[in-house]
Structures are given as C-alpha cells and as structure tokens.
Swiss-Prot record:
SUPFAM superfamilies: a domain/subunit of cytochrome bc1 complex (Ubiquinol-cytochrome c reductase), Transmembrane di-heme cytochromes. The chain crosses the membrane at residues 33-53, 77-98, 113-133, 178-198, 226-246, 288-308, 320-340, 347-367. The cytochrome bc1 complex contains 11 subunits: 3 respiratory subunits (MT-CYB, CYC1 and UQCRFS1), 2 core proteins (UQCRC1 and UQCRC2) and 6 low-molecular weight proteins (UQCRH/QCR6, UQCRB/QCR7, UQCRQ/QCR8, UQCR10/QCR9, UQCR11/QCR10 and a cleavage product of UQCRFS1). This cytochrome bc1 complex then forms a dimer. Heme b b562 binds at H83, H182. It is found in: Mitochondrion inner membrane. This is Cytochrome b. The keyword Membrane applies.
Amino acid sequence: MTNLRKSHPLIKIINHSFIDLPTPSNISAWWNFGSLLGACLIIQIITGLLLAMHYTADTTTAFSSVTHICRDVNYGWLIRYAHANGASMFFIFLYFHIGRGVYYGSYTFTETWNIGVILLFTVMATAFMGYVLPWGQMSFWGATVITNLLSAIPYIGPTLVEWIWGGFSVDKATLTRFFAFHFVLPFIITAMVMIHLLFLHETGSNNPSGLNSNSDKIPFHPYYTIKDISGLLFMLMTLMTLILFSPDLLGDPDNYTPANPLNTPPHIKPEWYFLFAYAILRSIPNKLGGVLALVFSILILMLFPMLHMSKQRSMTFRPLSQCLLWILVSTLIILTWIGGQPVEYPFIKIGQLASIFYFCIILILMPTTSLMENKLLKW
C-alpha cells in the first residue's frame, strides 16, 4: 500500500499534498483556516447543488421556489440555511486567513498571495450573485445598486450596465445569468484553489517565527490532519448552532419580502461581509471616486509584498507593527458597523474618517513603522 501511495500518478499528488508534505513543526491554529476554507467550499458546492435541483431562475417563481425548498423539500430548510450561513462562515474564515497572512508576513510568497487576492474577488462576486437569487427586496435592490456602480466607468459605463442586466433594468435576464454564473463560479474557485496550493507547495508553509523552517519539519499526516479535523469539528459545531438556533441572525428581514421594483427599502445594504467595502464606497461623495475606493480597498492587498519594509518577515517580534495591525482590525470593524447604518450624521463623518484611516495605515503608517523598527534594532 505504501508503494502505491508513493508511485501511483494520481495518489502520488495527494500523498505529496496532504500526507508526506513536510510541514513546519511550530505552525499554530492560525494555519487551520486554509483547510476550513476548503471544507466550507465543499459544503457550499454540495448544498448549492441540492438547492439548484429545486430552484427556478425566473422572476415570477424564484421567490416561491425558495419558499417551496424551505417548506416542502425534505430538510430543505436545513440545506438552505446551511448554504446561507455557510457563506458567512466562509467569509469569517477568509478574513481570518488574510489577517494571518498579514500578521505573519505570508504575503512574501507573492504568487500564492496574489492568486489568493484574485480568489477573494471571485468569492465576493459569487456571494453577491448568490444573494440576488432568492429574489427578495434586498436581492433586487442590492443587484440594482451594485451593478449600477459600473455606470461610473467613463464612456462605456452605461452600455456595460445594460449589457450585464440584459435589458434596461434588473429583470428576468439578469436573474438567469446570475444563476448561471453563481453555479459555475465555485468550480472555477476550486480550480484556482488548486493553483493556490500548487504555488504554496513550491515554497512550503510559512510559520509564526517567520524564519526558515527547513531544518525542523514534520510530516503533515498524522500531526496536522488531526489538527485540521479538530478545527473542522469546531467549525461544524459553530455552523450547526447558527443554523439550528438563529438561522436568520446574519440575514436581512427585507429579503423575506418578494422583490418589488416599485418600492425601495428604507436602507439598501449588502450582507454583513461586504459592509466594510460598502462603507468605503459610501464615504466618497463622487460616484467614480467611490467605485475606485471600493475596488482599491481590496486590491490594496496586492501591494502588501511591495510595502513590506521590515528586515523581519513576521510581526511576532515587532510590537509597534502589531499595535498598528490591531488598529487596522478595529478600523475594519468600525467600517462594517458604519456600512449597516443609515446615511446621516454622525455616521457619514465616522465612515469617512475610518476610510481615510484604513488607507493611511496600510499605505503610510505600516511601512514607516517597519522602517522605524529596523532603526530601533540597528539594522
């Protein structure tokens, strides 16, 4: 059996990726999120496939088909809420995974990091299109507002929006194509995850010290398979608690009202995991400026390898940079809160200040602090 594991062309790939993979002996629980994201992706694909078997992508029946899934399909409510809350878990883990990368300097693996940022964009696009599918009020108006942002693109904007809509407003054509894209994108994400892992296994994993760990590596199995399984059980426990006790905790009550183009909800807002970007978008009074800030708020992650000025890779031994990172985390939490608030004083001001702070910390304060720490260490 051992020989087959090491010699069979297909099993050999799995062996080198998950069994005999040399792994640093000191990686902490922060390195669990990669496997948890993989588990989330599998859950989303399975539950999504089961939902797609009962869902109809038509404006007249979409809302009713979701109701039918919850009421008449065996454990349909469980599948639907597992899919909706699974998306929330996905984003929680994504943000933790990115945060870990920033803290421990994992972005110095440039190829792995950049494919990860592209993955983030793809997952965000998939989640946005999935939110449109139940065809509730927030689905419809969210789709209208977010797709309309593309009209800010000079010259081709308005044509591009109509092209995406498949008409002169968000309608049947829009819903059908969003369903098609929402169905196919997770498989593209899976392929991209494989590329992400391919690049990662070229360099090997980073570790909390940020030092080269070639002299101290252990096999992935059984040490980290057990660790990943314990993380997975903890995740499933949390997810099931959320689904069974408060499935609508992270959702919007407006989405239980069927889409009505003639009636605008008082506060149009996306799901909680997009609120920080939505707050940055709203904090700029100019439409094009807002769209650029929105895109750049995530695209800025690609600049991290270039903005790394420290002689040390990880933040483990850099207390000043640690303080800045936690201020950045608090800024993002403030932005998330602001994104869910109405557009009025004092929320507008807080949002603008938090947005400025977000960009300043990443572009100016973090590199400057790194240089200062180098000086303090006489490097």
